[in-house]
Amino acid sequence: MRLNKYFLFFLLLLCFSNIKLLAQETVYSELGAGEIKKDWLIESHHYTAQIIIKDNQIILDNGLLRRSFLIRPNLACIDYTNLTNGQQLLRSIEPEANIVINKTNYAIGGLHGQKEKAYLNLNWEQSLHAMDADFYFTNYTISTIDSFVKYNPQTWMPANYGPSVQKFKGKQLVLHFASKLPALKGFIVNVHYNIYDGLPLLCKWVTIQNGADAVVVDRVVNEVLGLVEEESAVVGKPEEMKKQHGIYIETNYAFNNSMRYDISDHTTHWEMDSTYTSQVNYNYQTPCLLKVYPDKAPGIELAPNEKFTSVRTFELLMDSYDRTRRGLMIKKMYRTIAPWVTQNPIFMHLVSKNDAEVKAAIDQCVATGFEAVILSFGSHLNMEDSSTQNINRWKALADYAHQKNILLGGYSLFSSRTISPQDDVIDAKTGKPGGAFFGNAPCFGSNWGLGYRDKIVDFFKQTKFDIWENDGPYPGDVCASTTHPGHKGLDDSQWKQMNIQKGLYQTLNSMGVYINAPDWYFLDGTHKIAVGYREVNFSLSREQQIILNRQNIIDGTKEKTPSMGWGFVPLTKYQGGGPEAVLEPLQDHIKDYQQLMVQYFGAGVQACYRGPRLYDTEITRNMVRSTIDWYKKYRTILNADIIPLRRADGRDWDGWMHVDPSGTDKAFIMFFNPTLAPMTKTLTIPLYYTGMKGTATFMDDLGATKKYTLGVDHNIQITVTIPASGYKWMVIN
């Protein structure tokens, strides 16, 4: 009898184990599929984009998402499915886009007659009809996709992301629409879709080809989706309710200095749908209608035959609520659509007073393995001086740097300063300068602003500088001036200034210039933004900075690749603070100097080492050189995406892990001990996103190796000893 009890217990245990294993292994399987899907974050090459024309439908499908359109009686989206988990996102038919022309709203495509908006039954197709006032579908074209930015990297980047090997793989579908209305004769609207290989991602945007008459475009809504609600509430306002988690939206129209996209976004609108009369919310306030358009971009005048291009909307379908997985998905998106963000040169921030100091810094970079010098704010560089003497001076220094294989860059401020009453942003309320994001700021559409753009481009063309540190990028200021040549008035001022700023970044990137800019212009050509820190914290003690920097790294890489953010190391006094805050004299604080370097390089995050020099003695030089050599040895894996293991709290261990399932080194772990005593810990390490199966070999910083067998949950347990106030690293393959 006892034997039977044990046998029954064993069967139950086996059963539960199989259930757990099944749940883990089928989490990404397509509903109804006969095989387990490969996780695209680990093996993306299985999924190829295709555009299918079948009966009365056009279908975008890459094995990870499917978006389907009825063609007749007018084109309309009837299906938007995440194939990794079977989630149907669509509940209602909406227009493909909406445009407001000469104060009149027009629907682009779409069908009418859906009486129930909680769900869409395909058997209702025969009851749907088109409206004569709507733009009607005429035809389509299919092509391959290409980069939106003609990038030309001159700095280090992972081998598989350069333009010679990074082909933008996928398909483009363009849907063409026209109007039956005589007033819009010759006015063509094109709806563009990119579907990418290897990830559940679409890009959508609208182009307009004007006809023979001038028109005013007051709004272009380039995406409209009647989405299934994330949650219901009998009473509740839109801002109180969760939005659909199955789709992540990002556009190339974001700004506000927050160093995060979600806070910088100015285009995503979750609206109510009063035609959805069966919703649970009594006041019809469920946020279930997604629209994408800029808030402040009316009054765009189009001349006859002029072309207009809307913002680009990237739509990434999410299969999980897990923050780490969602972050990895977003980072994979950036690597795919903006591969220039993977460039990651090693630079110092030089504070210089004369040319001799620039040459000395270049020589120190050669001696230590640094790759670039950026003349920081407060240096003697002025890019706005277009005199022959100034250009020749800086070209000679750039030539000196290039002879030694060092890149040279510099700092220039656009916003957060005043130029003149004629060139500053004009406040619509007062009619005077002011009211800008930073209080006072120049208008990019003013004579000075347009001249600034041209001077920057000319400076880089003539001097052959390699890096631009553009502080105060255009932050979205509207301007009420009616005399600035770059915009007509208040209405079109934001749209026109944004295009000037984006055009400048695109031009410089195509010239091979690397761009640091503290605002969210990644999708139009910038490379790096601040990782996310409080500047005055660099006047705190080195001990505090060490912990705070590790917190910043964890927080700033949740949705950014390591290469997308810069950190900061004040070699000399910055923002106040005393001797306890700075590293000079460097040899006297060599332990803290090395700790800060290892933290940043161990995260793949380049810091701005701001000061007049990188070393002051041979001992310091050797430390810097050895740290750089270590980083370069593991550079590829250290630039892979980060999974946080434990956020720094100053009382226990903390650390992170890089993962690269396609690399030779599959993972790299950094452990830190903030306490004054050595620490031995037995830790669970999650290896699922390394793509490894069976066994994994760990090698630590002392060269010791050990092989581990992965559990069914893809985790292993290791015991690690971390030195007091120190660190330990491990590479896994």
What are these regions (language model features)?
Residues 25-60, 65, 77-286, 294-298, ...:
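Polysaccharide-binding surfaces and accessory modules of carbohydrate-active proteins
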Residues 58, 137, 164, 300-318, ...:
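Short Pro-Gly-centered flexible turn/kink motifs
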Residues 58, 62-63, 500-705, 719-724:
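Active-site-proximal substrate-binding groove within the catalytic cores of carbohydrate-active enzymes
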Residues 122-156, 315-329, 393-437, 513-524:
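Glycine-rich, aromatic-flanked loop segments that form ligand/cofactor-binding clefts
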Residues 212-215, 276-333:
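Extended acidic/polar, glycine-enriched regions
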Residues 348-429, 450-454, 494-503:
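Aromatic- and glycine-enriched glycan-recognition loops and surfaces
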Residues 394-399, 403, 407-465, 474, ...:
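Active-site-adjacent "subsite" loops/lids of carbohydrate-active enzymes
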Residues 709-733:
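C-terminal beta-strand-rich structural cap/linker in extracellular carbohydrate-active enzymes
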